[in-house]
Amino acid sequence: MRPVALLLLPSLLALLAHGLSLEAPTVGKGQAPGIEETDGELTAAPTPEQPERGVHFVTTAPTLKLLNHHPLLEEFLQEGLEKGDEELRPALPFQPDPPAPFTPSPLPRLANQDSRPVFTSPTPAMAAVPTQPQSKEGPWSPESESPMLRITAPLPPGPSMAVPTLGPGEIASTTPPSRAWTPTQEGPGDMGRPWVAEVVSQGAGIGIQGTITSSTASGDDEETTTTTTIITTTITTVQTPGPCSWNFSGPEGSLDSPTDLSSPTDVGLDCFFYISVYPGYGVEIKVQNISLREGETVTVEGLGGPDPLPLANQSFLLRGQVIRSPTHQAALRFQSLPPPAGPGTFHFHYQAYLLSCHFPRRPAYGDVTVTSLHPGGSARFHCATGYQLKGARHLTCLNATQPFWDSKEPVCIAACGGVIRNATTGRIVSPGFPGNYSNNLTCHWLLEAPEGQRLHLHFEKVSLAEDDDRLIIRNGDNVEAPPVYDSYEVEYLPIEGLLSSGKHFFVELSTDSSGAAAGMALRYEAFQQGHCYEPFVKYGNFSSSTPTYPVGTTVEFSCDPGYTLEQGSIIIECVDPHDPQWNETEPACRAVCSGEITDSAGVVLSPNWPEPYGRGQDCIWGVHVEEDKRIMLDIRVLRIGPGDVLTFYDGDDLTARVLGQYSGPRSHFKLFTSMADVTIQFQSDPGTSVLGYQQGFVIHFFEVPRNDTCPELPEIPNGWKSPSQPELVHGTVVTYQCYPGYQVVGSSVLMCQWDLTWSEDLPSCQRVTSCHDPGDVEHSRRLISSPKFPVGATVQYICDQGFVLMGSSILTCHDRQAGSPKWSDRAPKCLLEQLKPCHGLSAPENGARSPEKQLHPAGATIHFSCAPGYVLKGQASIKCVPGHPSHWSDPPPICRAASLDGFYNSRSLDVAKAPAASSTLDAAHIAAAIFLPLVAMVLLVGGVYFYFSRLQGKSSLQLPRPRPRPYNRITIESAFDNPTYETGSLSFAGDERI
């Protein structure tokens, strides 16, 4: 077996050069120990004999030299070099001849680093894969291995990157990584998971398996142990947009567009440039030059966070532009067009810059001072007098992937009680001041002046609820000391303040369970024996003749802008050598309601600012400057109630023009007057609730040069302006017009307003690239090629049936060099088609026609009728049908006489067979001609029958006799006494003869 071992020695040395471990594990049950089955693949894992541990790194790269490099990083670098158990990290496939040096980075232990992702590129490594003992496999030589390999191995964690040492025939991967892959540092949960890197070649898929067999013999070759290492080569074919991907880790370098590709491609490029600098530094990219073709894109993103941060794209990347990534990683992606267009070009330069902490938040009722925002810088906090700092007083900016402060910003609070030793000057305030205090409080403050000095208390504000809340100030150091002020006993505050007989004051504040108010604010000053105390004026200043205020010192007071001096003398003096004291009380500065101001600059405040103003107030201020000047009003604070009104008048009384009238809160704004005077009126709602602290208004005013004109308007390209008058005073109108071929975009008419600003923004002239809509044509429809009518668009008109097109049926939009695009012709018209008329028809005999005309136009209708006793035979209405020539729809009708015999003769009923569409007049005539004779005949026969049957009492069947009837002579003796009849005379009755 020794000859076989000698033959395998070169192969073993080659494998060791690639980092393969040939320790023979114990084989059992078809699988070597230390191998885990994960998704069908063999993955190496730590064994009990070789526990998992961290790997330390060393580097031969020079220390990062930057102008703002912090020494904190140098300690981390030196610490990494001094460790003795460090190993080299396996290499990463890298593009040959990179634009910038590719060096490994040390792994510093940064503050709070475990919770922040750090950029790490995966690097490949090799590992031995134990298999089943095999003794019949022949020896394997490196020559049988394909030069294109896919190698999988465990990778120790860490952010370092190194250039690989490639074997003969191997090439670095140029396959761009997946877009969804974001390189991040492994956290504690990822320490045992291997990284996988690939060396991939584009070609046909081929699988090659090589076997390495080593044998050892003990004794007389009685026992043989064989270890076989199998390396599987997988060559995949990936059709990618283009072979370009680079990684950069130096402090600065250049990014150039790919120009000389190793292999041609028939699709566009999709290139990635990954940049990583030291944690604690950001990436700054400057555009040196860029020239892209239409359709190409360049995007820049910041990496290292939960999601990529878009920074810029090709529309933002202009020459000289600087883009900064807020993290220490950045990625640039370039996508180009396929041949034959060819890719565009660009040249970028990147460098690392030191990241900084955010500016710390200033505490309310306090301030902050910052030495530097870079790592190592500090921030110091302090509170206003009367407030105590809660939290760290000093913060330090720590270096990390994203620098941060070592603690949260503190806050300033008003404590409930406390002991103040060596009290010289300061304030004590109730908890929550200037807001309301809490219920059920019992606070005690002990003030102690330096030895040999006394204390003076000044009441800045005392506001207690009208119940059992109480403030007591005692002239001593305990609760048993005699009180010098008790809110239960004193209704008004002492304007002159309080003086202690010794060096102590004891202040007690107690509140009950109901009601709350703003509380108190007391200012204290310590002063020496034989001197007066230091005076104080709220919202004002003073100047003194001697800083220690001995007897004879004079002090002069003044108020801040917007405040007025009240209830005191402007000048006071320290008198009485035996018991030094001021001859007058200190004055007070208050924001008053109303006033006349003649200063060139000043402030107008709401009444009692910053305290709440009162209800139902009506205040008027007059501001006056020189006649040739004007006033600018800068309204910086406006927080009033919805029922309150603040009005500005452009003049010296309330009848002037109103500049503006406002209610409710409003942000910062300015007003300008056209006069040398302005009147300000404030009216508060008498029924509204009082607002809180700093609710009101703050108005700064300034005297400005007279300016009765609006700013001069510039000319616009491809157009001109026409003012209504030479001077641009209020009311002036300026009209803008464009040259032929251009149109106005925006408002063409601008007016100078009262505030001396223009009513609209400046317009522009834009090139006209389309024709106007030619409109619709009556009695037609149109077909358009483009709805916006650009140059070259067409419009076709088609007339409705019965109408004839007059003009061009197709209009085309043509461009003109000296004007706007114009249609090739005017819009056509659709006129009614002209047809020959029908000749007039004569009226039928015994009939009439309507209308009576000789010619009738196409579509006209003629109506016929007959005289009484005649019946119309034919159509009562006929129409002139359009045509070439036009003709009548039916022949003309005739009128026939109506007879009784014809009524019984069916042939005479032709008129009755006329269509129901005949006129109502003809039907009435026919009915009358038939039924009236019948009715007359019936009446005649009935009358005769009635006469003979009723009046004569005879049967209707008896006929009169032809001879006269005999009669007897009537004598005189008869009883007939009718004087009408006499003897021998004749009388007639009815139709009979007597």
Swiss-Prot record:
One cellular component term (GO) for this entry is: plasma membrane
Q: Where is this region: Disordered?
A: 28-50, 88-146, 171-191, 241-261
Pfam families (alphabetical)? CUB (PF00431), Sushi (PF00084)
The identity of this protein, by name, is Seizure protein 6 homolog
Name the gene behind this protein: SEZ6
Q: Where is the composition biased (Pro residues)?
A: 93-107
- Composition bias of kind Polar residues appears in 112-123, 172-185
Q: Does the keyword Transmembrane helix apply?
A: yes
Disulphide connectivity of cysteines: 357-397, 383-412, 416-443, 532-574, 559-589, 593-619, 710-752, 738-765, 771-813, 799-830, 838-880, 866-895
